[in-house]
Regions:
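N-terminal subdomain of nucleotide-sugar transferases
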Residues: 1-57, 102, 194, 232-239
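Membrane-proximal helix-turn-helix segments that form the acceptor-binding/catalytic region
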Residues: 94-103, 116, 120-124, 132, ...
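Short beta-strand->alpha-helix junction loop in the catalytic core
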Residues: 137-138, 173-174, 190-203, 220, ...
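A short, active-site helix/loop in glycosyltransferases that binds the activated sugar's phosphate group
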Residues: 160-190, 197-199, 330-331
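Conserved donor-binding/catalytic core segment of Leloir-type glycosyltransferases
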Residues: 168, 197, 201, 207-225, ...
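Nucleotide-activated donor-binding/catalytic signature segment of Leloir-type glycosyltransferases, i.e.
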Residues: 256-284, 289
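Acidic donor-binding loop of glycosyltransferase active sites
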Residues: 284-303, 318
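A charged, aromatic-enriched C-terminal amphipathic alpha-helix characteristic of glycosyltransferases
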Residues: 344-345, 358-386
Length: 387
């Protein structure tokens, strides 16, 4: 780690501690100023826009920032208004913090728009260095023209922010994309820093001895996440295993849709909504299989991501069923930590469940072993070290 003492960290809720990144920052910086920005309306979460001030890992004070409640139907339409508000609040409070603290060493974010705000703060002398940890790429392709326009505009910020003082990528696919379109030279070297895993006790219980097969999902409830694949295969699953449960942790724009699907299904489904802290671990560790079956649509941003949900499943020794749209899918399959399926193959999901449940202990141990490779304390230091 370097000698930096203070950091501004900006992220969208509920991703502030994905891969234990907030924990790492709190462990390594004396003064931490976290801007949590709301994008989706999440049930069970009252405040979306918050500035949290930490000193020596302890929360000192929180400030509620301006909150614009928006129906899920109008999220993308009103992005410009929300973005202007976000811009003004980060600029104002960061400048105020600079006056109080005299020096702010690092501005760190995972979003292209907020990374651009960081470059402005550096230009006016508020912060010393900027770090952009690139989590995603939003293909400017979508059936909704408004969404397509917003993605195009976001991509312009992404190209600018790709020249922050420090740029790291969660996978090589994101870096190669920028090389292919000429943002970087072909021989440019940038660190690949995946989403990290936690080091949790391994408490595997052989799920084959349980009569109920329990699936788990954690994340934002959007149709693109493939949450409904369990409902789509309910009849076959019930015929094969007799009793099926589904634990769903999280909230999001399509939550009502999934709740309706659950009502029409004979599967026992429990929605937990957004859970504070890490209480979701207690829910997930009961589950036999983690769901990460992203729909392979060309407009799905998950093609370029490194989903934190998968790293969470692995940290708990939970085998994963995922689709082959992630770069990380190859590693899941090679390590025997789960099964990768073709989303549109009608038999693939049930066959994958059979395969995992037939050797659940083995798959579970492989998942936990893979998680050790990505322990967050091992992989994050290179992102914050300036040479």
């Amino acid at each position: 780690m370097n000698s930096a003492k203070s950091i501004i960290y900006v992220n969208y809720s509920p991703y502030e501690n994905s891969g234990k990144i907030l924990d790492y920052i709190l462990e390594n910086f004396e003064n931490v100023f976290l801007f949590s920005i709301g994008f989706y309306n999440l049930r069970n979460k009252r405040n979306y826009n918050i500035l949290s001030i930490y000193k020596d890992r302890k929360l000192q004070k929180t400030y509620s920032l301006f909150q614009l409640p928006i129906s899920s139907k109008f999220v993308f339409l009103l992005i410009p208004i929300k973005s202007v508000i976000t811009f003004l609040e980060i600029i104002f409070y960061s400048t105020w913090l600079k006056v109080k603290l005299k020096r702010i060493d690092i501005y760190f974010t995972v979003n292209a728009f907020t990374a651009w705000i960081g470059s402005i703060l550096k230009a006016i002398g508020v912060i010393e260095k900027t770090i952009f940890w690139v989590w995603d790429y939003y293909p400017p392709i979508h059936e909704n023209k408004i969404v397509m326009l917003m993605r195009y505009i976001y991509w312009q910020f992404d190209k600018i922010s790709s020249h922050s003082d420090r740029v790291a990528f969660v996978n090589r696919r994101l870096l190669d994309l920028r090389k292919d379109i000429g943002i970087f030279q072909k021989d440019a070297q940038y660190p690949i820093v995946p989403i990290g895993t936690d080091k949790l006790p391994y408490t595997h219980v052989d799920k084959k001895s349980n009569k109920k097969v329990l699936f788990g999902f954690i994340g934002v409830l959007k149709k693109s996440q493939g949450v409904e694949i369990v409902f789509d295969n309910a009849d076959e699953l019930l015929k094969e295993f007799g009793d099926i449960g589904y634990e769903i942790v999280g909230s999001g724009p399509d939550e009502d849709y999934f709740r309706e699907r659950a009502k029409m299904s004979d599967i026992h489904v429990k929605f937990y909504g957004y859970l504070e802290g890490e209480s979701f671990n207690d829910v997930l560790r009961k589950c036999a299989i983690g769901i990460a079956t992203y729909i392979p649509d060309v407009s799905n941003v998950s093609h370029y991501g490194d989903p934190g949900k998968i790293k969470r499943y692995l940290s708990l020794g939970i085998p994963v069923i995922a689709t082959n749209i992630l770069e990380f899918s190859n590693e899941i399959e090679k390590s025997g930590a789960g099964v990768i399926i073709d989303y549109y193959n009608p038999n693939a999901f049930v066959n994958a469940v059979k395969k995992i449940m037939g050797k659940h202990s083995e798959y579970s141990k492989n998942a936990y072993a893979l998680s050790k490779k990505y322990y967050y304390k091992k992989i994050y230091p290179r992102m914050f070290t300036f040479t």
